[in-house]
Amino acid sequence: MSDYFDQILKQAKQASLDMAKLTANDRSKILMNISGFLVARKQEILQANQLDVDRAKQKNLSAPMVNRLILTDTKIDQLAQDVEKIAQMADPLNQELEKWSNTTNGLQFSKVSVPIGVIGIIYESRPNVTIDAASLCLRSGNVSILRGGSECIETNRKLYECIQEALKDLQLNPYLVCFVEQTDRAYVQELLQAEGKVDVIIPRGGKSLIQTITDNSRVPTIKHLEGICHTIWDEGYPKEQAQSIIHNAKLRRPEICGATETLLIHSSHSAEDIAYVLDDLKSQGCEII
């Protein structure tokens, strides 16, 4: 293993011990601070993002790939608001999930939620994942090692600076969130081979990325593969609300892996109501097969 990645793993290990000392309120304060730094450094983030977008266009990346890269003033504001929402969530830790007893000897058992530990997150061209993933890991008391795609490295670096500044501002270990800044794919392999040092890998991206990680990881993974997201229009649901939900699910950001690809419609809906919903999609250039 390279000295560079070995250092990241050591930082993550120490950070996991420091993370265990934090209260739910401490973790909420971190997230609120991150939100504030995102807004305060918005222009720097946008400038870095423009570098990534320009480079992507020079490399003739596909339009959907370029669209995934783009951040705007509004998107950064929304990202900051999303972090605040995560900060306000109920603490997921130390919750009693199940309880039972042994009737023979009277022993009491409880299943309680605890952090996983160190989570490696590998993702492609959506820079907002840097903030989403880090925030969710912080809220749940986990240290994260983030490895984004090379196509959005400038944006990710700037976003990570916001995270580190937020942690340092609170006089906390800045490596509660770690970031693989080197874009060499060899470091992805090192992350996948870090058995015993990384507790789980969560990939977020296209089929080829997920398959590569599945085939090569010695660390347990939490993954999807094919995508093919479904939306179900069930019996008794009004066509107006169905149209709104289906429109959003498919057309809000059609280039992302979470966009609806399959629509299942209950047989009770009339042909006229179905046409009402599908015509809306067709009018926006969506092909119905």
Predicted feature residues:
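Conserved small-residue-rich beta-alpha loop and adjacent elements
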Residues: K85-M89, L93-A166, L170, S217-T221
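ALDH superfamily catalytic-core signature
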Residues: S125-N128, D132-V143, C162, A166-D169, ...
